[in-house]
């Protein structure tokens, strides 16, 4: 039983590294330069979900299937905890989580063929999630670079450490 608890703790620690990496990416001030207002929780959450969708897209494989499912579960549990900390009640949290899950799955679907899309198609996809942002083309370039950088690193790299964008 000791070994099992230890391995669960280690895996949770690894998953928190991925969660924290995604949070760090979504806090990148450069992402918000074309926003004509103060950023808010919803903006940061949208960027978190977009980053996470690209992360899953890049590392999706049969051999990573189980661990990516655990990372997915862990990240959405962490999001739920964050929403609770803001002070929402249970019913409100359930509604919000359903909205966020639907948003996430829409993003996953929209970026599935990202590398095959033209720049204008990418602009259209991102702008549907980032309506208040002006210079979406900068964000398209950012996410192209982000995916390129993900492809240069292993999943294990993100499990082991927290990086700053």
Label the model's feature ranges.
Residues 1-165:
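Surface/interface-facing alpha-helical segments and adjacent flexible terminal/loop regions used
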């Amino acid at each position: 039983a000791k070994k099992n608890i230890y391995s669960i703790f280690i895996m949770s620690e690894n998953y928190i590294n991925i969660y924290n990496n995604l949070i760090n990416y979504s806090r990148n001030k450069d992402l918000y330069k074309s926003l004509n207002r103060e950023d808010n929780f919803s903006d940061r959450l949208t960027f978190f979900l977009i980053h996470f969708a690209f992360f899953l897209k890049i590392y999706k494989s049969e051999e990573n299937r189980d661990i990516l499912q655990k990372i997915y579960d862990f990240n959405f549990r962490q999001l739920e905890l964050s929403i609770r900390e803001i002070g929402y009640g249970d019913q409100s949290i359930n509604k919000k989580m359903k909205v966020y899950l639907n948003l996430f799955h829409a993003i996953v679907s929209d970026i599935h063929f990202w590398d095959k899309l033209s720049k204008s198609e990418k602009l259209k996809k991102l702008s549907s999630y980032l309506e208040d942002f002006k210079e979406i083309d900068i964000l398209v370039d950012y996410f192209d670079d982000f995916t390129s950088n993900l492809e240069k690193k292993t999943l294990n790299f993100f499990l082991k450490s927290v990086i700053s964008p």
